[in-house]
Amino acid sequence: MRLAEVVRNTSETQIRVKINLDGTGQQKLATGVPFLDHMLDQIARHGLFDLEIEAHGDLHIDDHHTVEDTGITLGQAVAKAIGDKKGIRRYGHSYVPLDEALSRVVIDFSGRPGLEFHVPFTRARIGTFDVDLSIEFFRGFVNHAGVTLHIDNLRGLNAHHQMETVFKAFGRALRMATELDERAAGQIPSTKGSL
């Protein structure tokens, strides 16, 4: 099993992430941001990752640091669990619909961090959650997992549906990219021989 645990402590947040890439979708989430927990649950269930995240942040100010630092720490944990990337599929993609909403996520474990985020949210907030924080979450993940990530909401009227399809598609694309390919066992998935 490919497991990792990462702890990140700053003056703004204290975060612990534990992940099993070869899990069954079990999760234990306590970030202090209920909507973030709901989205992290989508990643775990649709990625079939066993995921534990505990976060304590400066929520008396706002959710920004907690959401961003959770993305950072999750990215670090995924990178640690994958290790040298031998045998992984490297690329992953998924389309996910939810009623009127449809999102596409494509990921490459290239070692080159890059985020293309194109989600025209129809509202600025989902309950109390600022939708802009989703960009900060994924930017933190990308920079610390070392991936190229393209996120596109192709259509949607309900902001909750837009957000949920993004996180579900991300979980499924991440699962595909991190899966071990039996035909490429022990090989780095690159013509360069390294990622």
UniProtKB/Swiss-Prot annotation:
Pfam families: IGPD. One of its GO terms (molecular function) is imidazoleglycerol-phosphate dehydratase activity. Keywords: Amino-acid biosynthesis, Cytoplasm, Histidine biosynthesis, Lyase. Transmembrane segments: none annotated. Its main location: cytoplasm. Belongs to the imidazoleglycerol-phosphate dehydratase family. This is Imidazoleglycerol-phosphate dehydratase. The lineage of its organism: Bacteria, Pseudomonadati, Pseudomonadota, Betaproteobacteria, Burkholderiales.
